[in-house]
Amino acid sequence: MDFLTADLCDEFSDRLQILAPGYASFGGHARFAGRIATLKVFEDNSRVREMLSEPGEGRVLVVDGGGSRRCALVGDQLGALAVRNGWAGIVVYGCIRDSVALGLLPLGVRALATHPLKSVKNGVGERELAVTFDGATFRPGDWLYADEDGVITSPDPLL
């Protein structure tokens, strides 16, 4: 990807939202972009697997995990599933695991931290709704751009 979030902020700041700093990059792609798809879950990644099983078509899955640091919502198996199905990236308001394996995948992954414990699988969660965390609202169909400097969203494509 050939963009810098700093340059996009300079040019389009009036129509952007910026995710608060603190999200580490765990995927093999530090820079990624795509249309947003959303999930709202809490310590249950069943819906994450469901969503990543669908064609990604270059989208970015934004998972509002409530900021939980008690288990991981994404690991190497879900990362590999995302790659197979054409997802550009995953942003998690929560934790991931299998960070070394995720780092080898051609996928963008941002999350608060790592945690070795897997989540429960009770099939609970909501999809394709606006989710807000850490200063930004993520709406299905909006655009997300992530690089080494941060994560931004826009209602319109910027590139």
Curated annotation (Swiss-Prot):
Q: Which InterPro entries match?
A: RraA, RraA/RraA-like, RraA/RraA-like_sf
Lineage top rank: taxon: Bacteria
Its required cofactor(s), as named, are: a divalent metal cation
Question: Which residues take part in binding a divalent metal cation?
Answer: 98
Recite the UniProt cofactor note for this protein. Answer: Divalent metal cation.
Please write the reaction equations for the catalytic activity of this protein: 4-hydroxy-4-methyl-2-oxoglutarate = 2 pyruvate; oxaloacetate + H(+) = pyruvate + CO2
Q: Which GO terms describe its biological process?
A: regulation of RNA metabolic process
> Where along the sequence do coiled-coil regions lie?
none
Report the EC number(s), separated by commas if there are several.
Answer: 4.1.3.17, 4.1.1.112
Top-level EC class: lyase
Under SUPFAM superfamilies, the record lists:
RraA-like
Cite a single GO MF annotation: oxaloacetate decarboxylase activity
Chain residues that bind substrate = 75-78, 97
Alphabetically ordered keywords of this record? Lyase, Metal-binding
Q: Which Pfam families match?
A: RraA-like
Q: Which family does this protein fall into? A: Belongs to the class II aldolase/RraA-like family.
Q: Which PANTHER family does this chain map to? A: 4-HYDROXY-4-METHYL-2-OXOGLUTARATE ALDOLASE 3-RELATED
> Subunit structure, briefly?
Homotrimer.
Primary role: Catalyzes the aldol cleavage of 4-hydroxy-4-methyl-2-oxoglutarate (HMG) into 2 molecules of pyruvate. Also contains a secondary oxaloacetate (OAA) decarboxylase activity due to the common pyruvate enolate transition state formed following C-C bond cleavage in the retro-aldol and decarboxylation reactions.
| Protein name (record) | Putative 4-hydroxy-4-methyl-2-oxoglutarate aldolase
Q: Name its species.
A: Laribacter hongkongensis (strain HLHK9)
